[in-house]
């Protein structure tokens, strides 16, 4: 289901019919992966990346993920309407207020996922 949407029908067909191995850098170029980490610094880089995600506004990230998933099936007009609704919801969260205050106070935000 996902592979043709990520890499296109022709490439997905070739990969599935041939069983060819795909190296990480090639998978990244095809859009199958977001990021590839070097073997030498893998654990350090992965933990830094995970820490970055963990310190983001998780409520907003969840809403964004929901919108991305819905966008696969919505019409353009319906998606714009959904995004408007979600924007209003997101703006009422504690994390939104924290983000705005942190920006105005020139400090790093401390999001709570609320």
Regions found by a protein language model. Give the residues of each.
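Interdomain hinge/lid region at the active-site interface
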Residues: 95-96, 102
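CoA-thioester-processing core
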Residues: 1-17, 29-30, 45-49
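Hydrophobic alpha-helical segments typical of transmembrane helices
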Residues: 2, 11, 63, 83-86, ...
């Amino acid at each position: 289901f996902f592979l043709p949407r990520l890499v296109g029908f022709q490439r997905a067909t070739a990969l599935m019919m041939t069983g060819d191995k795909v190296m990480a850098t090639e998978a990244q170029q095809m859009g199958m992966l977001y990021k590839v980490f070097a073997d030498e610094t893998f654990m350090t880089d992965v933990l830094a990346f995970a820490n970055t995600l963990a310190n983001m506004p998780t409520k907003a990230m969840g809403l964004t993920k929901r919108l991305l998933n819905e966008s696969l099936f919505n019409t353009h007009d319906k998606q714009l309407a959904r995004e408007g609704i979600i924007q209003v919801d997101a703006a009422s969260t504690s994390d939104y207020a924290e983000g705005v205050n942190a920006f105005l106070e020139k400090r790093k935000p401390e999001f709570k996922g609320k």
